[in-house]
Amino acid sequence: NFNAMVAAIDALGGLDIPLSYAEMVFMNDYCIETSQETGKSYTPVELPDPKPENEEEILGTYHLNGVQSVSYCRIRYTASMDMGRTERQRRVIGMMVDKAKAAGITTIFNIMDEVFPMISTSITKTEILNLIPTLMGYNIADTTGFPAKYKFADVKKASMVVADTLEDNVKELHKFLYGADENYQPSQNIV
């Protein structure tokens, strides 16, 4: 269900996202299904003609509505595969946070009124609304994908991302969260 994400992005006035030719092609394809599922409209991004030699190179920044932005998040078939998809998802979430903070608390409250009925959570709407003023002071310093070291494996006719070794990935995650620590060793439960 993409309705809440589409509604939130539309309420923020859309997002300005850098796109490659490959992303445009796949995003336009995903827009058809995303539009059908949400009942929201979109305009396909016009593809440059001729097609660029390097389809992965960023061609420019495009203003995308909710359907387009969610479809952009769904792309997994570019050269960066599933790791690129999760990177796009993190990018969109970061842009939404920045745009919401710039819009102010009133806009955020209005978005909450619109999207809260579309989500499922154990936190009440009042609890979330009470957190918003505090959250306005936070910044997303950096994001990363996990696992950091991985391989692809076929499991029951599906391709999956599998951690190379859990121990190495736990060390990478610890380093990302807490900084370099030469003495850190994962617990025996991980090893």
Task: Please give the residue ranges for each predicted region.
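Structured segments of extracytoplasmic/periplasmic soluble domains
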Residues: N1-S20, R76, M95-A103, E114-S122, ...
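Sparse, context-dependent recognition of short Cys/His-centered cofactor- or disulfide-binding micro-motifs
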Residues: F2, E55-I58, T78, D113, ...
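Short, solvent-exposed coil/turn elements at secondary-structure transition points
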Residues: N3, E23, K149-F152
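Flexible, polar/acidic helix-loop-strand segments at domain edges
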Residues: V6-T107
